[in-house]
C-alpha cells in the first residue's frame, strides 16, 4: 500500500484571520541553478512492513517554489546501488503542502535496511537510508534529543549521534524555536522575525533543514517525533497562551504552526486528516522487545493551574489545590483513554513513553513547596492516574523519555513516596540551547530524593540501548559552540530487566 498526501487546507479561514501572505509572496520559479532537494530527505514512523519517506521541493535559497503540482518519482531498494528495487512510482508535490512529499509505504519485508531517492525537476535527491522494524528484535539502539535553537548552538551533536549507529532518533520537542534570545550569545542568526503565520513557520523549518548535521541525521536514520511548545509559542497550553491572544486568533496561529510542522516531518499523513487538531500520538512496537508510545503533551492539556490563564509559572503546593483536581488533564481524554488501553494490553518486556515535559515531581525551593506548573507537577492528578497504570503487573521495565528543561536528569517514578518505583525517567538536555540560569532548580537533591542524577550545565543528548534483559544509557555532553566538539560521558547507566 502507498499513500500520498492530498492536502486539504482546513485552515484557510484561520490564515486569513492572521493576515497570512499568499504562497507566492516569498516564492520563485524553479531555475536550473536551484537544487530542488536542498532540504534533503527523511524517513520516519517505521513499522514491520513499511515507513514514511519525506522530501520537500524548494527553489534557490530554500525559498518556496512558484509552481503548481509537481510530479515526483521515487525508488526504494534493499541495496544502496539500487539493483534490487522493491518499490517505484510517481506522486505529486502539492503547492498547498509547500511541495512536500509524505510517501507512506507498506508491504515491505521486515527487519531490512532500505535505500530511497526521489527524482523531480531534472534533479535527483540524496540517497536516504531507513529500515523496517524486525519481527524478532534482540536489541534497540535509540538516541533521545530535544531543544535545538538555531541561534544558540551548532548541531554537531548529530555527528556523534550517527557514530553510535542508532536504529531510531526520538525527538521529544522544540525542534525549532520561534523566538530569539537577545541576551544570549549567538553562533548564527535567524535572519527573520518571530514566525506568526504559515509563511513564517515554513521559512523557519526550511532554515533548520539547511543545517548539514541535522540533514544528515534525517538522511541516515528513521525518526520518531513529537512536539513541545516552541514549535508554536513558549509555554502554550491548548489555546491558552502567553501573548493573551483570543482563542480564535491563537487557534489560527497554532494551526499555521502545526501545518508547517507536518510539512517538514516524516509523519504518517493518515494521522493528519484534521489539520486544525491533528493526532500526533501513536504507538510503535520494536518487534517483541519494546512498546514505545509517542505522546502529545501540548495540544490537549488543561490551562495552567493557579495562574493567569495565559501563563505557566511557579506555584506553591499549599496555595494551589487546583493542580490536583481530577478533571484536569495533560493528555486530553481521548489520548489518555488510548494510552490506558495500550498499557492494559502490554506484554513486551520494555515499555517506553516519549513525551515533551518533565514528568517526575520537582520541588524547586528550599522548603520543597514550589513547583513549576508547565510540567506534570501542574497536572498532579493526571500524573497519578498514569502512574497507577504503569504500576500494573503486566507493565514492566517502564522508561519515560522527556526533554524541555535544557538539563540532564535520571529520576525514579513512584506512585507514593513509601512505595517502590514503577518506572524510571530519563530527561535529555538541550541539543543546542542555553542552560538553566543558576539557582533555577535550587538544591534539587535535598528536596527530591527520587532524583538519582542531574547535570544542569551541559548540552547534548542521551544514547539508549535496550536488550531483553538489559538497558544501558549514556548521558553525552557536547560543546554547543563548536560544530566539531568531542563528546564527554557525564553518566553511564546500566539497568537489568525485571
Predicted regions and their residues:
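Metal-dependent phosphoester/phosphodiester hydrolase catalytic core
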Residues: 2-20, 26-498
Amino acid at each position: 500500500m502507498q499513500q500520498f498526501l492530498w492536502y486539504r487546507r482546513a485552515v484557510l479561514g484561520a490564515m486569513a484571520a492572521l493576515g497570512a501572505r499568499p504562497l507566492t509572496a516569498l516564492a520563485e520559479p524553479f531555475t536550473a541553478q536551484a537544487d530542488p532537494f536542498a532540504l534533503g530527505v527523511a524517513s520516519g514512523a517505521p513499522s514491520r512492513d513499511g515507513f514514511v519517506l519525506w522530501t520537500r521541493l524548494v527553489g534557490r535559497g530554500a525559498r518556496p517554489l512558484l509552481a503548481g503540482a509537481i510530479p515526483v518519482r521515487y525508488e526504494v531498494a534493499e541495496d544502496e546501488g539500487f539493483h534490487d528495487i522493491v518499490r517505484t512510482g510517481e506522486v505529486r508535490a502539492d503547492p498547498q503542502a509547500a511541495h512536500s512529499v509524505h510517501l507512506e509505504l507498506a508491504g515491505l519485508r521486515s527487519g531490512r535496511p532500505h535505500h530511497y531517492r526521489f527524482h523531480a525537476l531534472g534533479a535527483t535527491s540524496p540517497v536516504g537510508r531507513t529500515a523496517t522494524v524486525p519481527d524478532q528484535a534482540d536489541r534497540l539502539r535509540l538516541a533521545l534529543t530535544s531543544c535545538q535553537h538555531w541561534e544558540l548552538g551548532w548541531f554537531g551533536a548529530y555527528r556523534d549521534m550517527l557514530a553510535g549507529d542508532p536504529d531510531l532518533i526520538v525527538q521529544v520537542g522544540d525542534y525549532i524555536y520561534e523566538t530569539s534570545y537577545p541576551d544570549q550569545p549567538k553562533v548564527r542568526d535567524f535572519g527573520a522575525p518571530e514566525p506568526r503565520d504559515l509563511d513564517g513557520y515554513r521559512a523557519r523549518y526550511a532554515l533548520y533543514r539547511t543545517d548539514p548535521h541535522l540533514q544528515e541525521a534525517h538522511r541516515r536514520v528513521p525518526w520518531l517525533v513529537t512536539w513541545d511548545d516552541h514549535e508554536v509559542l513558549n509555554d502554550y497550553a491548548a489555546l491558552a497562551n502567553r501573548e493573551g491572544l483570543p482563542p480564535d486568533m491563537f487557534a489560527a496561529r497554532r494551526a499555521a504552526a502545526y501545518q508547517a510542522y507536518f510539512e517538514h516531518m516524516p509523519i504518517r499523513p493518515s494521522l493528519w486528516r484534521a489539520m486544525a487538531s491533528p493526532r500526533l500520538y501513536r504507538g510503535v512496537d520494536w518487534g517483541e522487545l519494546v512498546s514505545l508510545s509517542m505522546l502529545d503533551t501540548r495540544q490537549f492539556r488543561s490551562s495552567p493551574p493557579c495562574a493567569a490563564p495565559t501563563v505557566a509559572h511557579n506555584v506553591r503546593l499549599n496555595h494551589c489545590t487546583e493542580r490536583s483536581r481530577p478533571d484536569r488533564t495533560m493528555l486530553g481524554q481521548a489520548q489518555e483513554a488510548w494510552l490506558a488501553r495500550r498499557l492494559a494490553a502490554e506484554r513486551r518486556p520494555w515499555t517506553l513513553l516519549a513525551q515533551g515535559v518533565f514528568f517526575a515531581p520537582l520541588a524547586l525551593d528550599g522548603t520543597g513547596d514550589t513547583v513549576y506548573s508547565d510540567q506534570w507537577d501542574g497536572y498532579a492528578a493526571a500524573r497519578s492516574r498514569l502512574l497507577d497504570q504503569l504500576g500494573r503487573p503486566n507493565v514492566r521495565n517502564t522508561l519515560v523519555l522527556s526533554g524541555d528543561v535544557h538539563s540532564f536528569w535520571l529520576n525514579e517514578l513512584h506512585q507514593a513516596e513509601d512505595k517502590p518505583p514503577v518506572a524510571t525517567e530519563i530527561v535529555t538536555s538541550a541539543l543546542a540551547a542555553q542552560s538553566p540560569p543558576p539557582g533555577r532548580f535550587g538544591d534539587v537533591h535535598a528536596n527530591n530524593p527520587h532524583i538519582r542524577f542531574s547535570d544542569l550545565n551541559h548540552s547534548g543528548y542521551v544514547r539508549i540501548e535496550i536488550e531483553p534483559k538489559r538497558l544501558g544509557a549514556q548521558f553525552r555532553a557536547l560543546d554547543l559552540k563548536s560544530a566539531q566538539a568531542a563528546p564527554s560521558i557525564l553518566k553511564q547507566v546500566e539497568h537489568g530487566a525485571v
